[in-house]
Amino acid sequence: MTCNLLVILGPTASGKTRLGVAAARALDGEIISADSRQVFRGMDIGTGKDLSEYGDVPYHLIDICEAGSEFSVFDFQERFCTAYADIRKRGRLPVLVGGTGLYLDCVLRNYRLVKVPENPVLRAELDPLSMDQLAERLRALKPEQHNTTDLGHRERLLRAIEIAEGEKACGETGPVLPGLRPLVFGVRWERAVLRRRITARLKERLDAGLIDEVQALLDAGVAHRMLEHYGLEYRLVSQHLRGELNRNDMFQKLNSAIHQFAKRQDTWFRRMERQGVQIHWLDGAGDPLQGLLRVFMS
């Protein structure tokens, strides 16, 4: 079986972007980002776009939306299909790189997604419910819920329930990519080493101007509410800029939140394996590119 999609996944700060670019360069490929926040323009430092690493390697699904807008899993799958077909048509290898588990899953497990409009009747039914009641309803609809940001933000929670109910009502449609033959690699580090990498990278991002980036988004009209929606760096830096956290508290909370996020990513990847996705794990501390090429060429 010949691979027609190379996939490189891993937790935050694992070096998957660097490996993806190196693999794309070695195999005449183009990158498709599987990161739920890199689609937004102006969110560069906080999302780790690292565009300088790409050089002459073409990339897709980065900087395609205005910050402050919404971008759903359905939108990602639709855009992925377009980018994938375009790359294959030109005889090159699509290289899907990222750590957003739901985006990876919707491609690798061929989710049947539908575009779900807002449902005012359902919204009226949900409006009296508490956050705990809403979270319980979402878990009942989607027991595998991965994105805990949805559970702490009322508007995201309402929309997640709306989408889950809409998908349930519509049922399955036809397969999205019936001819997909993916080869999946993951970048793995010892936990203590990854923790050090996460903390070091956070310090680098703050030194590189992360706070100024968030302030620029606010100055451009992106509401604090949307920054809360985007989670992690954007939520906590926004709270710092509102005077709710001093810089040290912001750093400590953000560092802890990113460590927890990396654990949830690992949990999601293990779940993917249990559900039949074969992941070839590479040692981030070794030479992951050579390991990848050996498997690819075998």
Curated annotation (Swiss-Prot):
The residues that the entry says bind substrate are T12, A13, S14, G15, K16, T17
Catalysed reactions, as listed in the record: adenosine(37) in tRNA + dimethylallyl diphosphate = N(6)-dimethylallyladenosine(37) in tRNA + diphosphate
Q: Which prosthetic group or cofactor does it need?
A: Mg(2+)
The name on file for this protein is tRNA dimethylallyltransferase 2
Q: Where does ATP bind?
A: G10, P11, T12, A13, S14, G15, K16, T17
Any keyword Ubl conjugation?
A: no
As for family, the record states: Belongs to the IPP transferase family.
Q: Write out the transmembrane intervals.
A: none
What top-tier enzyme class does this entry carry?
A: transferase
